[in-house]
Structures are given as C-alpha cells and as structure tokens.
Amino acid sequence: MEPSQRNTKPPSFSDSTIPVDSDGRATVFRPFSLSSPHSRAFHLAWLSLFSCFFSTFSIPPLVPVISSDLNLSASTVSAAGIASFAGSIFSRLAMGPLCDLIGPRTSSAILSFLTAPVILSASLVSSPTSFILVRFFVGFSLANFVANQYWMSSMFSGNVIGLANGVSAGWANVGAGISQLLMPLIYSTIAEFLPRAVAWRVSFVFPAIFQVTTAVLVLLYGQDTPHGNRKNSNQNKLTIPEEEEVLVVEEDERSSFVEILIGGLGNYRAWILALLYGYSYGVELTTDNVIAGYFYERFGVNLEAAGTIAASFGISNIASRPAGGMISDALGKRFGMRGRLWGLWIVQSVAGLLCVLLGRVNSLWGSILVMWVFSVFVQAASGLVFGVVPFVSTRSLGVVAGITGSGGTVGAVVTQFLLFSGDDVRKQRSISLMGLMTFVFALSVTSIYFPQWGGMCCGPSSSSEEEDISRGLLVEDEDEEGKVVSGSLRPVC
C-alpha cells in the first residue's frame, strides 16, 4: 500500500546522530536526551501517564481519613477500588482506536484535560455513592497508558521497542508509588493550618493541577510520529515542522476504522496477552490499592509508615518494568520471539510464587522484603508482555494495545472483586490466592504462536501462505540496508 504523494527526503531531526530505520523510528533508545522528537515524545509520554497514575492513586493513601469523615464501610472502600479499575476498562478499549484515528499526542492530551476536573471533584464528595463515582471516573485517566505505548511504538524500532515501552510505562507507574508517599505528607502539611475534614479535600487540588500541566506540555512540545503530527482523521497527513512538507495518504488507500478494529479484535494473541497482563499489571494495580491498608491493619503501623511502605512497591517500577523490556529485547535478539515468550512465562511464574509467599509471611520486615522482591518480578512481567505486543499487528496496533491494556484493569477488577470484597476479608489469605492465580494464568503464554517465528514449544511454520498472511500484520525490523530481518529470527528447537 503506497501513498499517492510522499516526501522522498530522509527524515530530518535536530539530533542528526540518532540512527533511524526507513520509517524514521529510532533504532537506539536514549532516555536522557531531549534533542530528537523520539526522545521528546518519550519524556512527554511517561510524564503525562505519570500524572494520571498520581491522580488515580492519590485517593487510596487518604482512605483512612476519608472513611472516618464520611463513615465509609470496608465494602464501600472495596467497591470504590473496583470502580476505579472498571472505569479504565472502557476508556482503554476506546483509546486504542482513537490513537489509530487521531494520533497518540492528541488522544493523550484530551483524556488528561477531561479527567483532571474529576480528581478535583474528589474534594466535594459527601457520601459513599459520590465517593464511588469519583473513583470510577478518575480511573478513566489510566487509558493514557494505551496512548503511551502506542506513541513509543510509533517512535522506536522493533529492536528497542521492548526497552522503550518498559522504561516509559515503568517510569510512569512510579506515579502510583509517589502518590502513596506524597499525598499523606500533603495532607499532614495542610492539616497544620486547616481542619482535618477540610485538609484532605484541599489535597486533591495538587494532582489536578499536575495533570493539566502535563497535558499542555504534550500539546505544545509533542508530535505523533518522527515525521510530524497527524492533522485529521480523514487523511493521514503528517506535517514536518522544519520544512513544512506534507506526507499524504489518500483515504481510499488507508485501512478503514472497521478493518482496523476487526483486525485487532480477531487476533487471538491480543486476548492471551490481555489475560497475561491482567495477572501481571492487574495484580500490581490490586496491590497498589490494598497494600497500604494491609500493613496498616495487620502490623499496626501508622498512616505515614503504611504509605511509605506502599510507595516503595510502586516506586520500584523505575527500574523493574524497564528491566522487563530489556530482558525481552535481549532474549528476542538471541532467541527470537520464542525467547521473549519463555522470558515472560518464567518471570510471571516467579512473581506468582512470591505473591503466595507474601501472604504467608508473619513478620513486618519479612513481609516488606518479600514485597520488594515480588514488586520487581511482577512489574518486569508487565514489561515483558509489552515486549511482545508491538509484534502482534502493525495495522491494528492501537486496538491490540487497547485490548491488552484493558486486560490489566479487567484482571484488577476481577481479582479485587473475588478476593478483596466484603467486610470480613482476610487480606493475607487473599494475597496468597492472588499469587496462585498469577502462577496458573502464566501458563497461557504457551498458546501464543507466530507462524514465522514459532511459539514456546514449537518452531516456525513451514507454510509460506500462512507466513505471508501473518507477516502483513506484523512489525518488520530492517537492517541498515533495508533488508527485512525480523521474519527470520533464530528458532531454538
């Protein structure tokens, strides 16, 4: 499918030393640079998603204070936690096709602008119903994750996409941990000057302002692809700011929205990855929601200490999830897609076993230590999942990313509903059962098979017809001479 009118000049970036492929995507990952559009997109994407995580998880660390003020029952608090995840299920499913149509930059900014007033409205809640509704709508902001991963896949080539996705999402997820750490401190500071019943309400002004600020930065300094911004949804026009040249693809040459949607929904690999993400990232979300209360109730630590312990779980994302992406890329380079799948299974299985152990440790410091190690593996597993996602479908990448991302929140909703709902929940038992579910569902990775690359237990298909069909939907990496190399990754059996 060739465009009717194409700019024939090679991509021109302010950082002329950055190596790119034929589509202008960076073949190296430089997280500490701002000179190229790739690096700027990376920093804007993770910072925007960071603010959304901060907003969504700004409520749980203040739940003991809010519950006391509004007389919330344990079942109401649990229902609100489920509601926050349920909201993001629908928004993530919608975000994928939206990114395909209008681009990740605009999609991300629109979502942040729409959800910032919701977190601000948390200061106005006065009943259990309004508390649950606020958490439901605040959860919509987590769909920014889909735009984040879509944006990285548009900017970075296949040989570094696992690392780019892992670092971008990992650094963003730290927002949940920082929120657990800072919100009690913000509340305590404000409570020095205002009544407690007012102080917790004023605290929510800060995440709302932060979210709006990042949305403005995304619009001002970001661009959808290495070549420029998508101008509208009817024509795939990309404007190159430096040269004011336009790349045009006529509408009748583009895949229609329906084709994009069907291509993603009909790809079974997307649904398996959604299940795996539900019991890696979904488990992480559930832990973020319950871990502060777990240490507060079981070990009798104070609110600030519980928040600090919970924060350490989320903050480990700064290294753990990127490590998962690095492992995926390293195994992909050495063993091909099969290496990525084996790595995912091993890391997620270990995470499940550690979660089982976390619920069975009876000492405070022992629980903290196991929680730290568990956080490393469960977050790395999330990075490994999105080390596979970009290879499922090029045409329907947004839909596949949306399905997988929604799987994370569906997993969190199901897990919290089954294991952490009600007024008489034994959280230590529920945590161990959550780990067992993680271990069992990790086995589903064995069903993922790519005709040209194989799966965990068998090599690539010898059917050229099946390979040709699949290759048309997959990301293809190219070497410096433009030769496709991703379809011939080395089998291991």
Swiss-Prot record:
PROSITE patterns the UniProt entry points to? MFS (PS50850)
Q: Answer whether the UniProt record assigns the keyword tRNA processing to this protein.
A: no
Question: Which key words tag this protein in UniProt?
Answer: Membrane, Nitrate assimilation, Transmembrane, Transmembrane helix, Vacuole
Where found in the cell?
Vacuole membrane
Q: Effect of gene disruption?
A: No visible phenotype during vegetative growth. No effect on root nitrate influx. Decreased nitrate content in mature seeds and delayed germination.
Q: Which residue ranges are recorded for the region named Disordered?
A: 1-20
Q: Name one GO molecular function term.
A: nitrate transmembrane transporter activity
The leader peptide range reads none
SUPFAM superfamilies for the chain: MFS general substrate transporter (SSF103473)
> Compositional bias (Polar residues) at which positions?
1-19
An annotated GO cellular component of this protein is: plant-type vacuole membrane
GO terms under biological process: nitrate assimilation; nitrate transmembrane transport
Upregulation? Not induced by nitrate or by growth on low nitrate concentration. Down-regulated by imbibition.
Task: Please describe the organ and tissue distribution of this protein's expression.
Answer: Expressed in seeds, leaves and shoots. Lower expression in roots.
The record's annotation in InterPro entries points to: MFS (IPR011701), MFS_dom (IPR020846), MFS_trans_sf (IPR036259), NO3_transporter (IPR044772)
Instruction: Write down the membrane topology.
Output: Multi-pass membrane protein
The family classification in the record reads: Belongs to the major facilitator superfamily. Nitrate/nitrite porter (TC 2.A.1.8) family.
Q: What does this protein do?
A: Involved in high-affinity nitrate transport. Controls nitrate content in seeds.
The identity of this protein, by name, is High affinity nitrate transporter 2.7
